[in-house]
């Protein structure tokens, strides 16, 4: 496993990120990120750059960590989350897709029928090729999916981009997520419901929106939560026009110690808000390589919203099991919410 071996400046920057994260690791929840957010809110590239040391989780769980914020999902948190199962109602959170689904990337499909020699077992097999990233498939991003800008500071936790080859990544692959799963308390912050309907595509969700949705749901997002944020536009979100979280939400997510962030889009605003030219997709460009935040993109949240309203609560048990493909950058997934 390779560590960064770039310029002295890059090594110095990595050292600063490691020190900042290590110092923050023992702090009380909310102290570092909230103070930074109040003193220097993220409004553009420059303020985001200044926030990186406070946002970084490099070294928080040791120099060899490959789970990032999934470390917040402890066995105790999973046991606690099991109490969310009261009625047994199951809601799928992955979009159904197949041949004919628009916007699938690098997709091909072939069904092959067969009949064996006597006793003539008959059936069919299929072969699927799919790029799970993008807006058509519900998927989980591995921490090797997005590097620091240009890869100059490596990947999450300081791993070198040289670990990524044509055969996959030697570190931070999706198999690490698959080994522990995404299992815990889910919380839906239904921003669309609070605002009175689906957000116009291209809208930015702010920390104020998140806290308004918290109040409406009478919940508090906390350490180890699997956070779902609904903008309501669903498949209408695209790389051309899509709703998501403003960069100013990053300290909020860091402060709350969210384990997994899930959206009914890719989580970023498209096109990027004014001032974010170097960091146009902060949820991905900062969330993955600096926070070590596991992202669950393009979830189907309309059904979840309806179920929460009917059940009268906005918390539930979540189980999702990405595949254990070594070195993979992500996995299609169908998370299940259980009430």
Regions found by a protein language model. Name each.
Residues 13-14, 230:
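Basic side chains
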Residues 18-19, 144:
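Intrinsically disordered, low-complexity segments enriched in polar/charged small residues
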Residues 38-339:
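Active-/binding-site microenvironments in catalytic and ligand-binding cores
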